């Protein structure tokens, strides 16, 4: 396998389970954390940003594995579409690690939504008080077909999230996600939506 082109890594410190937010009998992990960091490495470039207090949800669903990081001012949601629909979100209590190979993924922040047909692996590692979430993405997405570029035959865009005005997320840390999504040549889902509405 070739060297990974993109890595998105979260370190969420002083994490503890949030029982009030957990759904019974659901394959999910819900935690709150005091602070954290997000590091992104793309083709030899690296950037790291601090995250304030927030929450994290990791949930296995029929449409893939969802990872949501919400720090109020800083928000990002990921959906990883796995290679095996029967995969379960089961924490390995002995190894304190969970791995989820995926074939494609979708990312949404407060100001940008994108999808990618690149494969990779998501790993989640638990320690006594820290959660490490790492998405390692290999290769480049396939070139778009002319039909898909105009929204013909393309999957519908992921649902948008309710978010405040643009001024709230035009900060350096929020700009990082936009920069990375463009750098790894993703197809903005918002662009798909605009073209579909205009057609």
Curated annotation (Swiss-Prot):
What are the record keywords, sorted? Host nucleus
Q: Does the keyword Transmembrane apply?
A: no
A cellular component term from Gene Ontology for this protein is: host cell nucleus
Major location (coarse): host cell
This protein's record includes keyword Cytoplasm: no
Instruction: Note the InterPro entries from the entry.
Output: Herpes_UL4
Give the subcellular location.
Answer: Host nucleus
Reading the lineage from the top rank, the first entry is Viruses
Which family, according to the similarity comment?
Belongs to the alphaherpesvirinae HHV-1 UL4 family.
User: What is the name of the protein in this document?
Assistant: Nuclear protein UL4
The organism named in the record is Human herpesvirus 1 (strain 17) (HHV-1)
